[in-house]
């Protein structure tokens, strides 16, 4: 009798995706983040579902319903802290996953990469609408500032903003629809993840060398299941440490005050994972220009495959491009720092320089470095 795992229509799909999947023998721990992101998504959907059972999406009760979850619901404080900090872990894994893709040339699998960029945008949208739900000061003003950016769109901008708000300001209608969006988007993300994996399994995984590994494959289970479990333990340990010892470390103190449309917080800023984009937005002293730069900072990922000039796929054997990659990393950390600072000197000029360097590195210096490295590989005699 043949193995049920290999014949049953449903089990067969799982088997080909997670058990008998041929994987390169040399993929490093940087390839763990895909599975970690899957775990993050699962944790977020589960904790989110339990929070939704007790949350009310009404301006008069939203803030107190979150307080009620933390005080009166069994382990409500834990569920809420896991959900809030789980979002941070999600973005940490996402940024490392994208960074891995950039470093090792994984973007050459264009369909997988493009679906990945769409996934990144969808997760960012989900996190944004989710941050509005507790209806604290930063929730309210964050929603006001970010939705207001759409008014920069010529001709239809103002109408579009009022349509999204469901009125003439961020109010009850906005909160209700944001809750609806926040509930549905994770399921859309799950569907996109399946498509992402579908395209990935058409080609198989890339590997650190960037060389075709068809001649040397090993089964995913047990080799990479056990390796992924190590990553999982480390991530869960980090998440639990953060959620149990310092749950409010990454949050904003202003969000402990209920939303008040008559009182603007001194510094409006998003969660840490949006600060780099927020810094780019603020670095341009023009509303439409800032919005376009903000969009470009993320959408630039879509043209990365077109900017690949090197004969080698990975940066593993390309020291000049490696240096530029780590400069880009440092630059993004600088932007993250600037996004959390007030709009005054010297932060303004640092933010503007970092924004220019960000686009220059990706669009000019890295493609040129690829060409230079190609030239250096040619025999000169």
Swiss-Prot record:
Keywords: Electron transport, Heme, Iron, Membrane, Metal-binding, Mitochondrion, Mitochondrion inner membrane, Respiratory chain, Transmembrane, Transmembrane helix, Transport, Ubiquinone
Positions that bind heme b b566: 97, 196
Keyword presence, Electron transport: yes
InterPro entries: Cyt_b/b6_C (IPR005798), Cyt_b/b6_C_sf (IPR036150), Cyt_b/b6_N (IPR005797), Cytb/b6-like_sf (IPR027387), Cytochrome_b (IPR030689), Cytochrome_b_C_euk/bac (IPR048260), Cytochrome_b_N_euk/bac (IPR048259), Di-haem_cyt_TM (IPR016174)
A UniProt-annotated Pfam family: Cytochrom_B_C
Disulphide bonds in the chain: none
Name the record gives this protein: Cytochrome b
Species name: Distoechurus pennatus
Gene symbol of the encoding locus: MT-CYB
């Amino acid at each position: 009798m043949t193995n049920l795992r290999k014949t049953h229509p449903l089990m067969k799909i799982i088997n080909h995706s997670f058990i008998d999947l041929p994987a390169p023998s040399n993929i490093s721990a940087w390839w763990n983040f895909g599975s970690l992101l899957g775990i993050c998504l699962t944790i977020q959907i589960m904790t989110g579902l339990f929070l939704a059972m007790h949350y009310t999406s009404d301006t008069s009760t939203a803030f107190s319903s979150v307080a009620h979850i933390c005080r009166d619901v069994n382990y409500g404080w834990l569920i809420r802290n896991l959900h809030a900090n789980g979002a941070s872990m999600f973005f940490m894994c996402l940024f490392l996953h994208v960074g891995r893709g950039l470093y090792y040339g994984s973007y050459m699998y264009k369909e997988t990469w493009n679906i990945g960029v769409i996934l990144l945008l969808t997760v960012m949208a989900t996190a944004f609408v989710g941050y509005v739900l507790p209806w604290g000061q930063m929730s309210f003003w964050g929603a006001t500032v970010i939705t207001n950016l759409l008014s920069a769109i010529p001709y239809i901008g103002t109408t579009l903003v009022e349509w999204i708000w469901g009125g003439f300001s961020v109010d009850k209608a906005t909160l209700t629809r944001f809750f609806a969006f926040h509930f549905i988007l994770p399921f859309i993300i799950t569907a996109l993840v399946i498509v992402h994996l579908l395209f990935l399994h058409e080609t198989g995984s890339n590997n650190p060398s960037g060389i075709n590994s068809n001649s040397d494959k090993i089964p995913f289970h047990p080799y990479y299941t056990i390796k992924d479990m190590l990553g999982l333990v480390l991530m869960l340990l980090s998440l639990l440490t953060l959620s149990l010892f310092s749950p409010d470390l990454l949050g904003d103190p202003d969000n402990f005050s209920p939303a008040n449309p008559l009182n603007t917080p001194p510094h409006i800023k998003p969660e840490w994972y949006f600060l780099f984009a927020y810094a780019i937005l603020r670095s341009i002293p023009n509303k439409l220009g800032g919005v376009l730069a903000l969009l470009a900072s993320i959408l630039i990922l879509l043209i990365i495959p077109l900017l690949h000039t090197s004969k080698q796929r990975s940066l593993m054997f390309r020291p000049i491009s490696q240096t530029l990659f780590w400069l880009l990393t440092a630059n993004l950390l600088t932007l993250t720092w600037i996004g959390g600072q007030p709009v005054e000197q010297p932060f303004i000029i640092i933010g503007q320089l970092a924004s220019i360097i960000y686009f220059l590195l990706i669009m000019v210096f890295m493609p040129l470095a690829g060409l230079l490295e190609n030239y250096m590989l040619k025999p000169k005699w």
